[in-house]
Design a protein with these regions (language model features):
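Active-site-adjacent structural elements in enzyme catalytic cores
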Residues: 1-202
Length: 202
């Protein structure tokens, strides 16, 4: 795994990483919450590599990162409440579970829904823009292990070709997950508190 430090001008590193993703290989990249293991979300072989690398059950869908609401609406259906939350908190530590469209079955474990987010991290957003489509965003660890907040905590055995190093990301607080495939339901409380979510969609 080649580690590329994201210094002041990291455009070249992002271009290299986007090229790796377009080839169907894996990249470790920073988000606003943790280091993620990424693959091209539209490439089933890349999704399978992520499952195998993390030792993750194929019955557990993989979340995706998009660069903006326009890209989100290309791959998922946003109802009024979901749009309200997205407008208020994204980019940010919020993951929305939405009915999917135009995504491979393997990525979503044959389910009709997908977990999608827009991370508040400029490097992550630019990486997704350079790829031109959604990027898998799952913690860069083995399933069941603590999520990494530094590159030193990322197992080399994950098989990522490149790791983008932005230093220590700080506290291990995950994104808040809200399911909009039925009545809005908080699946996991993270950085954004449940009462904030409920007041926004109530």
């Amino acid at each position: 795994m080649e580690v590329l430090k994201l210094n002041r001008d990291y455009s070249g590193s992002l271009r290299r990483a986007s090229g790796v993703l377009k080839r169907g290989e894996l990249v470790v990249y920073p988000t606003d919450t943790l280091y993620a293991l990424g693959g091209n979300a539209l490439n089933e072989k890349a999704a399978l590599k992520v499952y195998e690398a993390k030792k993750r059950s194929l019955s557990k869908p993989l979340p995706i990162a998009v660069s903006d609401l326009r890209m989100m609406e290309k791959y998922a259906y946003l109802d009024r409440d979901a749009k309200t939350l997205a407008d208020k908190y994204l980019p940010g530590a919020l993951t929305l579970i939405l009915e999917k469209k135009n995504l491979p079955a393997l990525l979503t474990s044959d389910l009709d829904k997908v977990a999608v987010r827009i991370p508040a991290n400029s490097a992550a957003l630019e990486l997704v823009r350079l790829v031109g489509g959604p990027v898998i965003t799952t913690s860069a660890n083995f399933t069941g292990e603590p999520p990494p907040v530094s590159i030193a905590e990322v197992p080399r055995e994950l098989g990522a070709e490149i790791a983008l190093d932005q230093g220590n990301l700080g506290e291990r607080v995950p994104s808040t997950i809200v399911d909009f495939t039925g009545e809005p339901r908080i699946v996991r409380e993270g950085k954004i508190k449940a009462d904030e979510i409920l007041s926004a969609v109530g």
